Amino acid sequence: MGASEMDARADVAVIGGGLSGVTAALRAASQGRDVVLVRRGYGATATGCGALDVLGASPCESLGLMTCAHHDPVHALGSLLKRLPAHPYAMLAEGPAEAWPAFRARFDAASDFLLDHLAKAGLAVSGRLDALTAHATTHGTLRLTNLAPLAVHRGDVAGLREARVALLGVEGVSVFDPAFVGRSLEAILARERPEALSAAAHRAVRIPWARAAGGILPVEIARDLDDAERREVFAEEVARSLDGGSFTHAILAPVLGLERHAEVLELLSRRLGIPVSEPLVPPPHAIHGLRMQKALDRAIAGSRVRLVSARVTGAEIAGRRIVALEGEGDGGAVKIRADRFVLATGRFAGGGLTGRGTVRESIFGLPVFHRAKPLGDRAVFNLLRPGYFARQPLFDAGIRADSELRPLDADGRAAYENLLAAGTILGGYDLALDGTGPGVDLLTGFTAGEHAAAT
């Protein structure tokens, strides 16, 4: 190959650098395998809200706080698999009778593994499979989930009792309006848990170095707070804004650092002496997702996994085995040879599926399914239904896999002997409606990494 071309060799090659791909790569590497992870850039993980729904409530449903108190994960899993038999969880459940014990064991192993890596990379994540927590959002709503970054988890409103909450905005950062969110929170809790809140006050924090005009993005201030001197100034301003108040909790604008988020959170918690949290932020300003992606990057950098920045355009194939990936990087052509491959490219946001005219898997030409039936040449516009919140066939379409996570061909056989799939490239569920997207990433990524290391 030419001087500007790259030819790499590994035991396992993972395509995709989001939650599922990184989990698969880290797991395979932890089993002693030589792993290459190839990605072209950030995908859906970096733009997600940061909540890790496993058996959570749909973000599109209007569910009250009683949902948290009465969450039954065994029933939730059984109901999900009955309603969505092609859901990826069905591949991990080992049959109806063993569904919950097998799923619980798999979740415990996967979550312990990933959360340990994230914590070491500077992002603490908290929560449980058997509980839902409720968190304020910048839209003034509540978002229920299983796992969340510590900065969000500390603000679980389902656990408040006689709380005196200070909501602190930052001058110029219009994404978070503390007065609006505070009034909304008071109204919701007055209806559903009147004992939760005794007072809510809103304040504004002035940042001396920020421009006076509005339109400042949360990530701009977050990057500023990665600097130690500016962190100290910010902590002083926050403490000053709370003078004269007696508060038990503080919800701050979602600006508490990017690369040094843990240090910012620890400093403020220590300085204020009360739990400090942030609201969840939907896209496009979803800083929690960007922090998670940065933490995944640091986890990869601290592991034995080799990262290759390239766009995979195709593969060298011999019979029913993949020999190598072919792609384009900044320095020219890239070829990555491996014994086993993991496809974790996501759906439309990550580039795993393309949807111009018909829906296609973008690298291997794998068939795309809806409800266990291949879409073939079915036009995209025939996969859409009236109604904004209607279940859209297009949005739960994806590839299918067997119990070992090997993608299937149109006849239901493993398409390739040495290819596995993980994450949202797998169909059978709707990311917006079913409250399981990150759980699928975590569980299938972990499992695919184990299978890739073992075979």
Model-flagged regions — what are they?
Residues A10-L37:
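N-terminal Rossmann-like FAD-binding beta1-loop-alpha1 element of flavoenzymes
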Residues G182-E192, A228-A250, G257-A315:
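Helical element adjacent to the flavin cofactor pocket in flavoenzyme catalytic cores
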Residues R40-R83, W209-I221:
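Conserved N-terminal glycine-rich FAD pyrophosphate-binding loop of Rossmann-like flavoproteins
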Residues A13-I15, V36-V38, V312, K335-G346:
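Short hydrophobic core segments
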Residues G41, G331, A338-R340, A344-G351, ...:
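Glycine-/small-residue-rich beta->alpha transition segments that form the dinucleotide
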Residues G314-K335, F341:
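Conserved beta-strand-loop-beta-strand element in the redox core of flavoprotein oxidoreductases
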Residues L26, C49, G350-S362, Y416-E417, ...:
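A conserved FAD-binding loop/helix module that cradles the flavin
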Residues G257, G332, H370-D377, L383-G437:
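FAD-binding beta-loop-beta segment adjacent to the flavin cofactor pocket
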